[in-house]
Structure formats: C-alpha cells, structure tokens
Regions:
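Short coil/turn segments at secondary-structure boundaries
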Residues: 31-32, 87-93, 141-153, 204, ...
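Interaction modules related to DNA damage response and DNA replication/repair
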Residues: 27, 42-43, 341-417
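Core residues of folded domains in eukaryotic genome-function proteins
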Residues: 21-28, 71-74, 124-137, 188, ...
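C-terminal folded domains that constitute the principal catalytic or ligand-binding module
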Residues: 185-186, 259-334, 346, 369
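Long, acidic (Asp/Glu-rich), low-complexity accessory segments flanking structured domains
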Residues: 1-126, 138-160
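Substrate-recognition "cap/lid" segment bordering the active-site pocket of phosphatases
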Residues: 206, 210-250
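Substrate-recognition element of Asp-dependent hydrolases with the DxDx(T/V) motif
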Residues: 180, 185-214, 230, 351
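Eukaryotic beta-rich interaction modules
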Residues: 55, 107-122, 129, 179-186, ...
C-alpha cells in the first residue's frame, strides 16, 4: 500500500475542487457555494442535517439491509432512505448489520455507567465529554466495498493491519471490515482525558462499537465501560442525554458530525466535519469524487479537524471553571460557555457586506447564512459603512464600499475570512483573504 500523505502539498492549497466540506452552504476552504459544486465534497462541515446528509439511494439499502436507525428518514450508517430497506420500527426483532437487535423505544438496556455528579466534577475539575464514533473519530467500510482505485492502492480483501497508517481489520459478528482512525484521534483522547470524563455514543450496534473503541482505547483507560450504542438508546434515530444516568445538561459537552442526532441538546454540541475516508462512504453520501484513500491523502495531524476540536475543548473547559471560580461554584453552565467561546471569535469586529450587480444580493442580506455566521461569531453586521466599521467583506474590488475601505484604511476581506473563522473558531489573518479579480469571478 502506498504511503498516505497528510494534507497534501501546502504550496498548492487550497485543494479545491474537490471541496473538503461546507459551512452553511459554503466550502470551508475556497468559499464556493455548495449548489455550484455538483456534490464535490469529501464531507460536510458544521451545517444543518439537511445540508449534511446526502441521500444514499436504493443501492445502499442492499448493502445495509438491516438499518441500525434513521435520522431524518436516512439510515444513520449507510444513508439509505427509510423506505428502501425496512424501517427501524419493523426491525425490532432483527439483527442489524452489526449484530445487535434494534431496540424499541420502550426497551433500552441500562448498562451505561453513571456520570459523576456536579460536586465530583467540580472537585476533579472535569466535565462530561460525549464523542460520536463513526465519521467523527474513525471511518469503517466492508472489505468487499473497496473501489477499483482503492484496490489499486492496495486495499484488498487480504489487507492486514497497518498501525503506521492507523488502519485495522475488525470483524464484528464475522463481517470483515477495515477501520481507519482519524488523524489525531488518539492524541485528542489522551489530552482530553485530563479535562473530561469521556463517553462514546453511537447509534451503531454494541459489538461493532466496542471493537472499534478498543482500537482507540486498547487498555480502556479513557472510556472503560462508558460506551452507549443502539442497545442503550431509547430511539434508533436520535441521541439523548437521558440514557446516561446522572448526566446534566449544564456539565456535558458533545462532539458529533450530525447535529440532527441531538435535537434536544443543540446548545451542548460542538459540530464538526464528517470524516469520509473510504470511497464507499463518499458514495453513500452521494459525493461523486475520489476518496481520501483513493488519492493517498489524509487529514493533517497538527491542524486537522480533531486538532481544532481539542483547541475548542480546552477553551470551553477553561471558560467553565473560570466561571465556577468567579461565581463560587454557582450558575456555571457549559452551554453558556460554548456560546461565549463561539461568540468571542469575531468580537470587536463591525462588518459591512459589499455587493456588486453581478452578485446575488440575497447571499449577503440580513439573515443570510454568511450574515448569521458572522453574528454567531460575535461580529456586529451593518448595512452601511461608517466610522465604526472595521471590516468590509466583498468579492468585487471595484465596489464603492471596497474603495471606501481602502481609502479609510479598513480591513477589506473576501467572504472566506468569515467562513474560515467559523471553521477554526479563531479570527484569521485578514491578509490571507484579499479581495481581487479572482474573488470577483
């Protein structure tokens, strides 16, 4: 198998197309609109479920005939439509692809260890961290699902473990599969364990979950028995904190690639981009591009998606316990801290969007996705420039407002500056986002 490169050639960045993911309808790197890219994305970053989950089609139903559960009418594993291969409610007596029976809402098991109470968390200076498994910490595929290009890269049914590439064979219930750990996954767990009591929560079956968690945590030092699977979930189509005894909203942080899986806990959620390493996963989410495995590429360790998440977790943890200290242990709520951390990114920036006749005015008006993102990050958005304006966001360098920014020595940036800040949870260097003829095209 050829050696996998991490991140590709920096000199050629950004690597678009294919687009690595979309933030509220825009590519997180180049800023292209999703509807203009013909599905050319490896994964979807921080968007709504309708943006994130691509319809898998009936072919997927055949490869996942017993679906573990459905989110917004799509199988949580293969992406097939709920009507394509049976619904979760009709499969209660069946064994799913991972071998566990799909549990009815009234009959979950209760084997999940109890979460520490608030007093214990405050004493140990820890919070609760719930991590999704598939597409967040790793990606798995069946050995017979490799594409022709992947087979040419050495991905065959006879493939062996390759720890150097973090590729491992697993066989839950005798189904041969290959799991690829996401770069930085083990480092994330090692560093986060000092700040959090950690759980894995997946809608997949328990044996599949436990086999893959063992790859991440072979000695059980990070998770122990704190693994929530479809057996423990009360519903096959959503996740809820009530399956973890003692878990309180005010002390729980959630990291997941699917926001619709947590309809009751959106304020606890740190939404991240979906990890789709194998071609079969790209196909299931309807991305007609070469997979990372096909291209011999992977996310970078030092500044990939999980490294970004760890940085956010550090800030949330610090913010929570700073609040505990300031209020003598009272009223600290991690949900408010997450909003505050997010809202600090562009705090102090007053942004005005500049349009040209060639651009879609709806793209930058009030309540548009880019306007909402800027406000979520703490910026003040205005319709017209004045002495308080700090940034003019434009694609065309010849607009009146763009010229005003140059004349008044204000920051003139293209829209990617806001999108990148949202992806990285940090204000970006304005010089890296110039407005020129290329951005106007």
């Amino acid at each position: 198998m050829s050696e996998v490169e991490q991140g590709g050639n920096d000199d050629a960045a950004p690597h678009c197309p294919p687009h690595p993911g979309f933030v509220r309808g825009f590519c997180s790197i180049c800023g292209a609109r999703e509807e203009d890219t013909e599905g050319g994305a490896l994964g979807v970053v921080a968007g709504t479920e309708s943006e994130m989950m691509k319809q898998g089609g009936d072919d997927n139903a055949a490869s996942c005939s017993h679906h573990p559960g459905f989110v917004d009418g799509l199988c949580s594993k293969c992406g097939a439509k709920e009507g394509a291969g049976g619904s979760a409610s009709t499969l209660a007596a069946a064994r799913n692809i991972y071998g566990d029976p799909v549990m009815q809402a009234s009959a979950p098991t209760t084997n999940v260890p109890r979460a520490p109470d608030r007093a214990t968390l405050l004493r140990t200076k820890k919070l609760i961290l719930i991590l999704d498994l598939d597409h967040t910490l790793l990606n798995s595929t069946r050995l017979n699902d490799f594409s022709a290009i992947e087979r040419g890269q050495g991905f065959t049914r006879n493939i062996k473990d390759d720890p150097s590439l973090e590729l491992f064979r697993v066989e839950p219930y005798g189904i041969p599969m290959l799991t690829k750990l996401r770069p930085f996954a083990r480092s994330l767990l090692a560093q986060a364990s000092a700040m959090f009591e950690m759980y894995v929560y997946t809608l997949a079956g328990s044996v599949y979950a436990k086999e893959n968690v063992k790859l991440l945590d072979p000695d059980g030092v990070y998770f122990g028995e704190r693994i929530v699977s479809s057996l423990e979930s009360k519903r096959p189509d959503m996740k809820n904190l009530d399956v973890i005894p003692g878990a309180e909203d005010a002390t729980v942080v959630i990291v997941d690639d699917t926001d619709a899986a947590w309809p009751l806990h959106q304020d606890n959620l740190i939404l991240m981009d979906r990890y789709l390493y194998f071609a079969s996963e790209c196909r299931r989410f309807d991305y007609q591009i070469e997979s990372l495995a096909e291209r011999g590429l992977d996310e970078r360790e030092h500044d990939g998606a999980l490294a970004v998440v760890l940085d956010v977790l550090n800030r949330v943890h610090k913010g929570f316990f700073d609040s505990v200290h300031e209020h003598d242990g009272h009223c600290a709520d991690v949900r408010a801290v997450i909003r505050e951390v997010r809202g600090q990114v562009l705090r102090g920036c007053t942004v005005v969007f500049s349009l040209s006749e060639s651009l879609d005015e709806l793209e930058y008006e009030e309540d548009s996705p880019i306007w909402d993102l800027a406000e979520e990050l703490g910026a003040v958005c205005e319709l017209d420039v004045d002495e308080t304006t700090t940034h003019v966001v434009a694609e065309d360098p010849d607009t009146e407002k763009a010229q005003w920014a140059r004349d008044n020595i204000k920051f003139l940036v293209n829209p990617d500056w806001i999108k990148a800040a949202g992806f990285w949870w940090r204000r970006q260097d304005e010089q890296d986002f110039p407005v020129n003829r290329e951005t106007a095209e």
